Amino acid sequence: MITREFDTIAAISTPLGEGAIGIVRLSGTDSFAIAQKIFKGKDLNKVASHTLNYGHIIDPLTGKVMDEVMVGAMKSPKTFTREDIIEINTHGGIAVTNEILQLAIREGARLAEPGEFTKRAFLNGRVDLTQAEAVMDIIRAKTDKAMNIAVKQLDGSLSDLINNTRQEILNTLAQVEVNIDYPEYDDVEEATTAVVREKTMEFEQLLTKLLRTARRGKILREGISTAIIGRPNVGKSSLLNNLLREDKAIVTDIAGTTRDVIEEYVNINGVPLKLIDTAGIRETDDIVEQIGVERSKKALKEADLVLLVLNASEPLTAQDRQLLEISQETNRIILLNKTDLPETIETSELPEDVIRISVLKNQNIDKIEERINNLFFENAGLVEQDATYLSNARHISLIEKAVESLQAVNQGLELGMPVDLLQVDLTRTWEILGEITGDAAPDELITQLFSQFCLGK
């Protein structure tokens, strides 16, 4: 594999702030030369690749010792970027890592753009686009199941499936071309309408099956957006805090104290549940509270799941009935809170099974998790250990386009169109799938994707 010629880049690869270790990473042809200028220890040009080397970082202009470090020296092509890589392991801290980064830049490196290390890995053929995106998914994963899907994608499970399908499509196209250009050849199977239809239906079934994993994959990657709704002071914020096991929302006896939308994540059965505690939906003259109410209504419309909290110790109010009405078309769980008090709510007016809870006494909170599990996971068979999942919106959109293109081929065959006229749609399918792996992705898309990465990755 021939790597492209790039300048040498540098960035801090660890989160900013205090920590045990901070890492300044360099990648490029001059990585070793730049590091050698500021490192006092072994000659990095002579050490074995993939070794850690003890020494000190020295400012060559002043002779000042900046820090005691371990320098990782990795020579191309067996590195993440397929370039020479230096990783300076410093004591963690904003000042020391920044000063060492500035030294590297002063001696000839350029400050890396967000995601530029991974972008170089892609451009140099170390990873394809799906694997590069998986790197960010691993960083952002909130549960073990989300991380497992990202790791499988990084290992190439999706890439292999897409590449194998593209190769089969290419073989079919080649067969059609040979039949058109060299009809006298008997060694090649004739690309009849029946043969092409069988192949395209096979491709369509494969991609459709992959699309069926999208809902589960998206849930695992992004979580279930869950709006906690109810009139003011029924215990929404207390429920949020109970589920999170920590105080995040303002909990008082004063109606209207949650004036905005509060978002937090909780792990339910290995799946991230994005809990959105909304301001109580009611008529109010308070401008700030009005904004919170409008945001609550928006969160309700966009939620995958609605937890409607009612006060079991009070009769249903007009606001309760309004919330029951506007949430009836959603995935909804009705919670009767404050069951530690005498129950006066009219349960006969409630349209479905409810869960009786007492947030104050921590009663039946586990039943909420059980119901969520039944709603989303149990019947769907959430995770198959060896399955390949679609979870990325870009991938899902492109697979949908590829399926549409294959359907156009099959519709054309049913109408009796000649096979050679349908090459355009079959070729388009091949190109669309190439956008997923990056083989046919435009430069603008690649730049936009990597710009979403963090610095130093």
UniProtKB/Swiss-Prot annotation:
<keyword id="KW-0547">Nucleotide-binding</keyword>
<dbReference type="InterPro" id="IPR004520">
    <property type="entry name" value="GTPase_MnmE"/>
</dbReference>
<comment type="subunit">
    <text>Homodimer. Heterotetramer of two MnmE and two MnmG subunits.</text>
</comment>
<dbReference type="InterPro" id="IPR005225">
    <property type="entry name" value="Small_GTP-bd"/>
</dbReference>
<dbReference type="InterPro" id="IPR027266">
    <property type="entry name" value="TrmE/GcvT_dom1"/>
</dbReference>
<keyword id="KW-0479">Metal-binding</keyword>
<feature type="binding site">
    <location>
        <begin position="233"/>
        <end position="238"/>
    </location>
    <ligand>
        <name>GTP</name>
    </ligand>
</feature>
<dbReference type="InterPro" id="IPR018948">
    <property type="entry name" value="GTP-bd_TrmE_N"/>
</dbReference>
<dbReference type="Pfam" id="PF10396">
    <property type="entry name" value="TrmE_N"/>
</dbReference>
<feature type="binding site">
    <location>
        <begin position="252"/>
        <end position="258"/>
    </location>
    <ligand>
        <name>GTP</name>
    </ligand>
</feature>
<dbReference type="GO" id="GO:0005829">
    <property type="term" value="C:cytosol"/>
</dbReference>
<dbReference type="GO" id="GO:0030488">
    <property type="term" value="P:tRNA methylation"/>
</dbReference>
<keyword id="KW-0819">tRNA processing</keyword>
<dbReference type="InterPro" id="IPR031168">
    <property type="entry name" value="G_TrmE"/>
</dbReference>
<dbReference type="GO" id="GO:0005525">
    <property type="term" value="F:GTP binding"/>
</dbReference>
<dbReference type="InterPro" id="IPR006073">
    <property type="entry name" value="GTP-bd"/>
</dbReference>
<dbReference type="Pfam" id="PF01926">
    <property type="entry name" value="MMR_HSR1"/>
</dbReference>
<feature type="binding site">
    <location>
        <position position="252"/>
    </location>
    <ligand>
        <name>K(+)</name>
    </ligand>
</feature>
<feature type="binding site">
    <location>
        <begin position="277"/>
        <end position="280"/>
    </location>
    <ligand>
        <name>GTP</name>
    </ligand>
</feature>
<feature type="binding site">
    <location>
        <position position="258"/>
    </location>
    <ligand>
        <name>Mg(2+)</name>
    </ligand>
</feature>
<feature type="binding site">
    <location>
        <position position="257"/>
    </location>
    <ligand>
        <name>K(+)</name>
    </ligand>
</feature>
<dbReference type="GO" id="GO:0046872">
    <property type="term" value="F:metal ion binding"/>
</dbReference>
<feature type="binding site">
    <location>
        <position position="254"/>
    </location>
    <ligand>
        <name>K(+)</name>
    </ligand>
</feature>
<feature type="binding site">
    <location>
        <position position="457"/>
    </location>
    <ligand>
        <name>(6S)-5-formyl-5,6,7,8-tetrahydrofolate</name>
    </ligand>
</feature>
<feature type="binding site">
    <location>
        <position position="25"/>
    </location>
    <ligand>
        <name>(6S)-5-formyl-5,6,7,8-tetrahydrofolate</name>
    </ligand>
</feature>
<dbReference type="Pfam" id="PF12631">
    <property type="entry name" value="MnmE_helical"/>
</dbReference>
<keyword id="KW-0963">Cytoplasm</keyword>
<keyword id="KW-0378">Hydrolase</keyword>
<feature type="domain" description="TrmE-type G">
    <location>
        <begin position="223"/>
        <end position="377"/>
    </location>
</feature>
<feature type="binding site">
    <location>
        <position position="233"/>
    </location>
    <ligand>
        <name>K(+)</name>
    </ligand>
</feature>
<feature type="binding site">
    <location>
        <position position="126"/>
    </location>
    <ligand>
        <name>(6S)-5-formyl-5,6,7,8-tetrahydrofolate</name>
    </ligand>
</feature>
<dbReference type="InterPro" id="IPR027368">
    <property type="entry name" value="MnmE_dom2"/>
</dbReference>
<dbReference type="GO" id="GO:0002098">
    <property type="term" value="P:tRNA wobble uridine modification"/>
</dbReference>
<comment type="similarity">
    <text>Belongs to the TRAFAC class TrmE-Era-EngA-EngB-Septin-like GTPase superfamily. TrmE GTPase family.</text>
</comment>
<protein>
    <recommendedName>
        <fullName>tRNA modification GTPase MnmE</fullName>
        <ecNumber>3.6.-.-</ecNumber>
    </recommendedName>
</protein>
<feature type="binding site">
    <location>
        <position position="87"/>
    </location>
    <ligand>
        <name>(6S)-5-formyl-5,6,7,8-tetrahydrofolate</name>
    </ligand>
</feature>
<dbReference type="GO" id="GO:0003924">
    <property type="term" value="F:GTPase activity"/>
</dbReference>
<keyword id="KW-0342">GTP-binding</keyword>
<dbReference type="InterPro" id="IPR027417">
    <property type="entry name" value="P-loop_NTPase"/>
</dbReference>
<keyword id="KW-0460">Magnesium</keyword>
<comment type="function">
    <text>Exhibits a very high intrinsic GTPase hydrolysis rate. Involved in the addition of a carboxymethylaminomethyl (cmnm) group at the wobble position (U34) of certain tRNAs, forming tRNA-cmnm(5)s(2)U34.</text>
</comment>
<feature type="binding site">
    <location>
        <position position="237"/>
    </location>
    <ligand>
        <name>Mg(2+)</name>
    </ligand>
</feature>
